[in-house]
């Protein structure tokens, strides 16, 4: 029976890896425009535009808060997330919190590690360290489209090319961000792309949960065997 559980773990691990590879491959084809989506009536969408970062996003530095908003941790794994939702042990003084910036749902955040892991997205309202650069769209966009694009290898490489010759840990400035061209399909195609890629993410998450449950089941089984 233990062999069957091991086989299930192997299968789920392989499935997750294949889904990740599929997502990566299909994203490359979508953003190279080898794959194009069509509108609901079957007609073709207009050609993609290219816009500089500052034609879509402005930088926000709102420190007008009374410090009762949750402090957000900015991580490559979770994006912007309240610190108390993850194991984040750094403490801050009330005085330092007063200088923190307000982050709204739908904001994007450039961190010290964006040259490694891209730009993070916030699904939460909170406050973050003034060291971070907060980006907010001032024209209509699909947030998920850019959330996914900003984590792509090709975009991270573009961020890196802007930092050539600058030491590790250098913050990407709004000026650097603004100089990079961003793909800009019409909003309807942005939404189609985001929905399609999000559906793959859902399958990946479901597989990861199944894998975790199966591993926990095996662990419990082994504990019972050796009691």
Residue ranges of predicted features:
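DNA target-recognition patches
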Residues: 57-94
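Short, charged beta-turn/beta-strand-edge "cap" motif at the junction between a beta-strand
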Residues: 114-118
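Non-catalytic DNA-recognition/assembly elements of restriction-modification systems
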Residues: 39-64
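A short glycine-rich beta-alpha junction/loop motif
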Residues: 112-113, 127-133, 166-188
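Amphipathic alpha-helical coiled-coil/heptad-repeat segments
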Residues: 1-47, 183-227
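Residue "hotspots" at secondary-structure boundaries inside conserved domains
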Residues: 95-101
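Short, surface-exposed loop/turn microsegments at beta-strand edges and helix-strand junctions
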Residues: 64-76, 101-102, 119-130, 137-141
């Amino acid at each position: 029976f233990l062999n069957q559980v091991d086989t299930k773990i192997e299968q789920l691990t392989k499935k997750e890896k294949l889904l990740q590879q599929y997502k990566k491959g299909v994203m490359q084809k979508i953003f190279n425009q080898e794959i194009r989506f069509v509108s609901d009536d079957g007609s073709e969408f207009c050609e993609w535009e290219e816009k500089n970062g500052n034609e879509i996003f402005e930088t926000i530095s709102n420190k007008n808060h009374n410090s009762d908003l949750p402090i957000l941790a900015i991580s490559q794994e979770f994006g912007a997330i309240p610190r108390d939702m993850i194991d984040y042990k750094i403490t801050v003084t009330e005085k330092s919190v007063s200088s923190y910036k307000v982050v709204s749902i739908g904001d994007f955040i450039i961190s010290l590690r964006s040259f490694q892991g891209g730009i993070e997205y916030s699904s939460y309202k909170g406050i973050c360290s003034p060291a971070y650069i907060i980006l907010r769209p001032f024209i209509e966009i699909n947030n998920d489209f850019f959330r996914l694009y900003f984590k792509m290898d090709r975009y991270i490489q573009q961020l890196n090319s802007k930092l050539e010759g600058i030491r590790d840990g250098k913050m990407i400035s709004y000026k650097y961000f603004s100089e990079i061209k961003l793909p800009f399909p019409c909003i309807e195609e942005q939404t189609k792309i985001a929905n399609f890629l999000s559906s793959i993410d859902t399958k990946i998450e479901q597989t990861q949960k199944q894998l975790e449950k199966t591993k926990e089941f095996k662990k419990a089984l082994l504990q019972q065997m050796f009691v």
